[in-house]
Curated annotation (Swiss-Prot):
Residues 4-48 form the RPE1 insert domain. Keywords: Cell inner membrane, Cell membrane, Cytoplasm, GTP-binding, Membrane, Nucleotide-binding, RNA-binding. This is GTPase Era. Residues 248-325 form the KH type-2 domain.
Amino acid sequence: MTNRHLAKFAYREEFKGDTEALAAAVREDASTGSTSQLPLEVQFGKMSNQKTVSVCIIGRPNSGKSTLLNRIIGEKLSIVTPKVQTTRSIITGIITLKDTQVILYDTPGIFEPKGSLEKAMVRCAWSSLHSADLVLLIIDSLKSFDDITHNIVDKLRSLNIVPIFLLNKIDIESKYLNDIKAFLTENHPDSLLFPISALSGKNIDGLLEYITSKAKISPWLYAEDDITDLPMRFIAAEITREQLFLNLQKELPYKLTVQTEKWEDLKDKSVKINQVIVVSRESYKTIILGKNGSKIKEIGAKSRMQMERFFGFPVHLFLFVKVRELWENNQEFYQYMKI
């Protein structure tokens, strides 16, 4: 386990059960200039030159939002697959560069939703704007500037938000790139435009330099080595869901969700994890299990390896499949998915 991971989880345990109160205290003291609300551990470590900036990353599905978050924080935190709508909730990533803490929000892709789950995902994406100092609108330069992207820009303008445009995937030749640049320059001259490649990292340093230049004097909300505030149970469920997306065909990945039902720390410093894959039909369960359980064993093995790589300790993973009809309309699952 890397030092960053150790610090991340140690911090969560130190303030377990009261992280919201801690964050509220930090914000209160940031506005008053006082440290009276903070725990002594934080008061003594408080530095007068600490700065913070929060950044929301929005855009269409598969435009590269999650890849950008992972690139900036230097860890694969947000799951990435070739399928659209992989990200279902807000994923918080954190990176501290010298005296500046950057808090990033990866969001579900914005599209024209149909079902209840899709509508909840899009609402979740828009809700993230309220927490951000900067809004990055990431645009896939390999595709035309379509009506959905126009609508996103128009809604941002209606909210008096001037987005920063990121033209992603510039490492691949595109017939649309110059036209998109010309359109944005002519119609949105007050917005900055950064051509980038989230995958290769091209121009990311310049983007980060701009982001940190907009940070304001404020105590950090997280420990210096934290990379996220997400619970480990949630991250483990996301890792398994990623493998389901990668190993199942067609529409099936959109018809399931994953919950971590049990997390048990064992004496040998390994962890036993029980997860439930929830599907809406018996036929979906049959596909996930595979012949003689071969498919779920494959998915379980790949998920376990990813968890061990991320968490840094041995994992004993047990997967179960349950059928819950119309789970997509159940608010209980939305709460678990944080949407």
